[in-house]
UniProtKB/Swiss-Prot annotation:
GO molecular function, a single term: tRNA (guanine(46)-N7)-methyltransferase activity
Binding sites annotated in the UniProt record for S-adenosyl-L-methionine: 44, 69, 102, 125
Protein name, UniProt field: tRNA (guanine-N(7)-)-methyltransferase
Function: Catalyzes the formation of N(7)-methylguanine at position 46 (m7G46) in tRNA.
Binding site for substrate: 129, 161
InterPro entries: SAM-dependent_MTases_sf, tRNA_(Gua-N-7)_MeTrfase_Trmb, tRNA_methyltr_TrmB_bact
């Protein structure tokens, strides 16, 4: 479903202290945009309405987070959900940066100096048609870009409801010299301890769809 345009979204975002309107300006220097410059940096690609980031960020003040999506209409909802989570936990909101960015061009805002330690990819578009598969966030074309700014031993955490995307992504990771260190094809019955349920995850689970999850380590 296409989201209705919200003309008030960008002004609200630009008034937000943790929104970064022009992320390219910080390429290679992201650590210095955070209050605690010594924290490791984790990246969420396609943060959606921010459910995942709101929980992760507020639970882990010792980690800095970059959350990316493309539409202001989505980002403004993420902004509100993140603010709400921090307020409810009485936490200082100083370890999250929210920004608009086309993920296919992620290499225009991050480089090897940024030393990202973990990437989260949750329920991305599966792009099932062969001619579109290069658009997948787990495709080798993208993984090659991630390798540039992901530290050696850094991880990609990937969740999806889509069987074909999951199985083909296993091959993508192998081709790009990642080691699969954890894998389950039924996350909710796997015993995996710290799983933050996203809005898409909840919807798919209610439909009886098993959630696939893996952790891939950069070699």
């Amino acid at each position: 479903m296409r989201m209705r345009r919200k003309p008030w979204a960008r002004p609200e975002l630009e008034a937000c202290d943790f929104f970064v309107a022009n992320p390219k300006e910080n390429k290679g220097n992201w650590k210095n945009t955070f209050k605690n410059t010594e924290n490791p940096i984790y990246l969420e690609l396609g943060c959606g309405k921010g459910t995942f980031m709101a929980v992760h960020g507020s639970d882990h003040p010792n980690i800095n987070y970059i959350a990316i999506d493309i539409k202001d209409e989505v980002l403004v909802l993420a902004k509100r959900n993140i603010e709400k989570a921090y307020e409810e936990k009485n936490k200082a909101l100083d370890n999250v940066k929210l920004m608009p960015q086309e993920i296919a061009l992620i290499d225009t805002i991050l480089d090897s100096n940024d030393k990202i330690e973990r990437i989260y990819i949750n329920f991305c578009n599966p792009w099932p048609k062969d001619r579109h598969k290069k658009r997948r966030l787990t495709h080798t074309r993208q993984l090659t870009k991630y390798r540039d700014f992901l530290v050696d031993g850094g991880e990609i955490h990937f969740k999806t409801d889509d069987d074909e995307l999951f199985e083909e992504s296993l091959e993508y990771f192998k081709e790009c010299n990642f080691e699969i260190t954890y894998i389950t094809r039924d996350l909710h019955n796997s015993g995996y301890e710290y799983n933050v349920v996203t809005e898409h995850e909840e919807m798919f689970s209610k439909q009886g769809i098993k959630i696939k999850f893996l952790i891939a380590k950069k070699l």
